Amino acid sequence: MKTFKNKEELLKEWEINGACKDGVEFNKSCKDLQEILEKCPLKFRRWRLIKGYVQFAEHCPWEEMKGWEWVRLLLAQPQYEDKCYWGKLTGGDWADLLIEKQKYEVKCDWEKLSEADWDYLLYYRPQFK
């Protein structure tokens, strides 16, 4: 988990971490690290959290994340499960999550899974039959 002391450290990391051009430009447009952390748009913030940049969690608008965004984040960084708005996950989102992380079966809203979602899930994880 990478943390930064200042904007310059962050900019240096962003030269090598595969960040998109728009994300780099956003960083440069801010006056300091605190402004970056506070004002970072969700579309950049979720990528940064997935990559393990934990400082971006503090000002995250968790309630605005969509189900598929939660799946991607939880697969990469399960420590954020206590922030998750589980009701945002669709049946397809649940299938994607459960295929990779069966531990979330206790959280699953099974009624959201359609027949197609069940077929998909059971193909990869027949133990859920």
PLM segments and residue spans:
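Ankyrin repeat (ANK) tandem alpha-helical domains that serve as protein-protein interaction scaffolds
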Residues: 1-129
